Amino acid sequence: DLNVRQYYMLKSDAVMSGVVSDVTSDNDWQFLCEQNVPTGTTAETPFRIQGTIPHPFLWDTEHPHLYLLKTQLWQGEQLLDEAEVTFGIRDAVFKKDGFYLNGKKLRIRGLNRHQSYPYVGYAMPESMQKLDADLLKKELGLNAVRTSHYPQSHYFLERCDELGLLVFTEFPGWQHIGNDTWKAQAVVNAEDMIRQYRNHPSIILWGVRINESPDDDPFYEKTNAVAHKLDPTRPTGGVRAIKKSHLLEDVYTYNDFLHDGETPGCDPKKKVTSDTDKPYLISEYNGHMYPTKAFDNEERRSEHAIRHANVLDAVAGQEDIAGSFGWCMFDYNTHKDFGSGDRICYHGVMDMFRNPKLAASVYACEQDEIPVLQITSSMDIGEHPGCNRGNLYILSNADSVRTVSYTHLTLPTNS
């Protein structure tokens, strides 16, 4: 069954109609439902229209099926207002042992994304917003993205809906919690986020805690209550950098920066969470632990890639971790005290212009749609101290890779 809630302020009776059509496949069916809207219905008094979609197709990461709902508000023959929204039908659940989409366990594998671009900041059009989603899904082979640390362009979210890219979004903020007036506005921000974005099927988790902030139970009880009231279908998360933090949300989301190249890729769930019966998701890793420029030497760029691989490998080995989001998709502008002296954070697996670093191939070779074969060295001895090429890595999603040392040898045809 399909339940639609609309918000209006009316001075006299009206009729609301709703038409649903299939926008993903070639099905030409549609259904119509109508409901009388009584005088006095306001923005705070929603009314519902109900209908049934016959044999619905489910939205998932491989087949992101979408439907279109068009609603119209009529008084007699006069059309007062109309609206259109796309939506999907899916069952997304976080459990103690991981994340399940439509009943199937799915390991979340994603990156964090800022909404910034070189020179123009956030002022980029629809096409570029959508291109970032394409890069995440098609070039990097990911199934998820975290919109750190604020809700992002609807164009980006719409493309995530179309591609089947899972989204963890959160209300604005970074580390700081202000006074009571500030907190009241933050609760409003959480409410606005959910009202504006809740029809996106790609969104699987609401972030209702200021990123990396300390515990504040009275404040976060309010943000969680708002989220559960406005959208009881989705769980809440709260990104922190604190182990054994007070858990008011449905999912313990934690920035795990344990790995330094020598230490394990991540901490086990039981060492981090305050309630091991609740789901656990790693919301950030790497990033500032090993900033790497696209023009750094090969050793550093290679080490950067291997650190990302180490964390992915560690997460994959622990069945009770729902997944992880690396920090981050691309380099970005920052304030003078946080970058590399040039107001740029070189934390991305891509540079600011979305050109891939070696670490990008680590993620790309996790998918099986596009062949990936990347060598971490140019093999030029002048690039290395003492002409010693050091460790060389081959990043690939192939079942096997054969290397040949002498170019005069004939390659086997099945290599």
Q: Where do the model's predicted regions map?
A:
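Secreted/periplasmic carbohydrate-active enzymes, especially glycoside hydrolases
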Residues: D1-R159, L163-V167, N189, I204-L205, ...
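Substrate-binding/catalytic cleft of secreted carbohydrate-active enzymes
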Residues: D132-K138, A144-N355, A359, Y363-L392
